[in-house]
Structures are given as structure tokens and as C-alpha cells.
Curated annotation (Swiss-Prot):
Protein origin, superkingdom: Bacteria
Protein name as catalogued: Deoxyuridine 5'-triphosphate nucleotidohydrolase
Native source species: Orientia tsutsugamushi (strain Ikeda) (Rickettsia tsutsugamushi)
CDD domains, per the entry: trimeric_dUTPase (cd07557)
Reactions listed under catalytic activity: dUTP + H2O = dUMP + diphosphate + H(+)
NCBIfam families given in the database record: dut (TIGR00576), PRK00601.1 (NF001862)
Pfam families: dUTPase
Keyword Metal-binding appears in the UniProt entry: yes
Length: 148
């Protein structure tokens, strides 16, 4: 599937287009479209531009997710992961990041900061009923299936 993309920010010496790291990658890396380094202090958030805008077909969304390396090594994640980019949004993609670590985290220009997964979704309509179909689980929730 071809998707239209607008480059809002041009990186010097490298591409700003989202890219798959390997042939088996589900997510494409997104890059920090910043001109100079920026610090995210512990327990603070930052809105980081990705330097692109996209035009997804109806019935598709882009999910913005954390990169596992940033999360495991530094405690830096996408705050609302997965963030949803709707098919009718045409503005620049911006990533809400939070530093859950204990030290300042420095973002550098063109750093890989998040990943984007394109997913198909269904548009539904509601059918109001008095009762739902029975299941073995029923209304049990919040730990009812145990830990092991």
C-alpha cells in the first residue's frame, strides 16, 4: 500500500522518512525533527515533532508506540502509547514523550524516538440489547484469571 507523506522538516545528511529497521519489523522508526538537542527532565513530558504529515486511507490508523530500547535503558516512553493518528488528520505528527527515569534524557536531532505501526480498523454501529451472551468468564475482571 502506498501512503502519501509530506516532509515538513528536512534532516541534514539523512532521510526523515519513517523506515523499517529490518525486513520483519512491524513498526517504522520515527525521528526527532529538532534542530538542536533537547532535554526531558525526570517525570516531565515533551511534545516532539516528527517532521512529517501523512494521508492514510479511510479505515486505517497509524499507531505511535514506544521504542523498547529507550524504555528499557532510559525509562523514556510514548506517554499515550499507542497514540492514534486518524486517517483524516493532516497535521505534523508529534510524539508525547515522558521520562520516567531518574536522570535527564537528551534527545538529539534525527534520534529514533518512537515507532509507527499502520493498522486497519473497523467502523462499527451499536445494537442496544438488554442482555449480553454468556461466557465462562462472565463479569470477572481485574486479576480474576490469576498470575500463573
Amino acid at each position: 500500500m502506498k501512503v502519501k507523506i509530506k516532509q515538513i522538516y528536512q534532516f541534514e545528511g539523512t532521510s526523515s522518512l519513517p523506515a523499517y529497521s529490518t525486513n520483519g519489523s512491524a513498526g517504522m522508526d520515527l525521528y526527532a525533527a529538532i534542530a538542536s538537542p533537547m532535554i526531558i527532565k525526570p517525570h516531565e513530558t515533551a511534545l516532539v515533532p516528527a517532521g512529517i504529515a501523512i494521508s492514510l486511507p479511510y479505515g486505517y490508523e497509524a499507531q505511535i508506540r514506544s521504542r523498547s530500547g529507550l524504555a528499557s535503558k532510559f525509562g523514556v516512553i510514548v506517554l499515550n502509547s499507542p497514540g492514534t493518528i486518524d486517517s483524516d488528520y493532516r497535521g505534523e505528527l508529534k510524539i508525547i514523550m515522558i521520562n520516567l527515569g531518574q536522570k535527564d534524557f537528551q534527545l538529539t536531532p534525527a534520534m529514533r524516538i518512537a515507532q509507527m505501526v499502520i493498522a486497519k480498523y473497523e467502523v462499527i454501529s451499536w445494537e442496544i440489547v438488554d442482555d449480553l451472551d454468556e461466557t465462562e468468564r462472565g463479569e470477572k475482571g481485574f486479576g480474576s484469571s490469576g498470575l500463573k
